[in-house]
């Protein structure tokens, strides 16, 4: 496994791989890797000849400086995990390598609508930062396929739209959520939880599943369903942040024509903002 820190060296290797006709897969990450990331890597390995994993804590997608400062950086551990998975390349640049002129005045990619709705409404600039860095990685790595987790449902939808709108010839693979045995969705931010909070954390998935059962049974009293879910979260020790029930295919409000819904749930538990989602076929 080769660890690359410079754009120049990355381009040299990508040029060689292209000349050799290799099929390239990209797995973009911010590091602090867990089994959910390894699932992305496994999917990438099954889909291509060469796997490139990027590890970059992207300052453009953080709306709070304190959140950026405390985001875990575990490059050595991450590389050991990736080496065991027989990843070919790790691209781990510094912010100065990615943004030589700094982020102020940086050309950016914005996906209208999807960038500012739902999660984007509470995190201004976040999705613009995501689409900009992913677009930049696509240009540098020139992958045939890229793998993203379905846990970040809105992010995946945004990237699919960006790829379609910008004409990228890249297959986007969404990889299902990986959960701990107690149901908690794996996330780098779970590391912010204390031992006691970790015991409470699976309650998010339980509330999510209860909402899914109601929708599958044909209940369409969305305001009431959401109010009950918020109350249940707060009673369990969470601070409910945002619960949305949207059309799984458009992320717009449900209509009579909607066949599948996605439940998007976010709640604070101590210093950790936990997110989860579930797709459900709507009952009649």
Swiss-Prot record:
Places the protein is found: Cytoplasm
Protein name in the entry: Pantothenate synthetase
EC number: 6.3.2.1
Gene: panC
Function of the protein: Catalyzes the condensation of pantoate with beta-alanine in an ATP-dependent reaction via a pantoyl-adenylate intermediate.
Binding positions for (R)-pantoate per the UniProt entry: 61, 155
Gene Ontology CC, one term: cytosol
Binding positions for ATP per the UniProt entry: 30-37, 149-152, 178, 186-189
Active site: 37
Keyword ATP-binding among record annotations: yes
Catalytic activity: (R)-pantoate + beta-alanine + ATP = (R)-pantothenate + AMP + diphosphate + H(+)
Superkingdom to which the source organism belongs: Bacteria
Keywords assigned: ATP-binding, Cytoplasm, Ligase, Nucleotide-binding, Pantothenate biosynthesis
